[in-house]
């Protein structure tokens, strides 16, 4: 569950699992799960000490400071915005596309009635701009199809307000933990939106070092929860074996 989940939300999660017939051994905070995932990777240097988990998904943002000592993972403090994510970047891109289309044709796009179509196209452009400086797409509109080109710089300018919000929340986490960037060993990335260059650049500016890369940020939490479950199952099995041996005696 998100680290920011209050007790009521955690209870609701447990109730939902129970209704679905799922036996819950324990709830794990998403930053803790992400840390378990990174720690399980053979190609990643051992993660210990104070770690920042930066989780930017499609619809929400969570930033947590955690402390790792061996198998013990403690969430020190968390900040976030449950209404800030990659979809907000897509909406800003739609506005840019609409402005360019209007400049070319004199007419605006019918965003209200074709919202899903334009959101899908905006996401495609956003992903393309993570690996190249410019992207051109043929946009269907009331004045007919028009080829529109958008640069990474234009995209970054359109989402600047959201980037500043991410930066502010990161700084709040640092203040809340009483730690400085030099006291943080790693920044762990979670969520597909962390692939956006301006996002990782902002993290590096705040933390004074680049975040860890080269991992599957989309599946970090789910994979980490599986690793955690495996560790819990192993402990349970070991305890059961010890109990069985004790009973034989």
What are these regions (language model features)?
Residues 1-249:
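Oxyanion-binding/catalytic loops of NTP- or PPi-dependent enzymes
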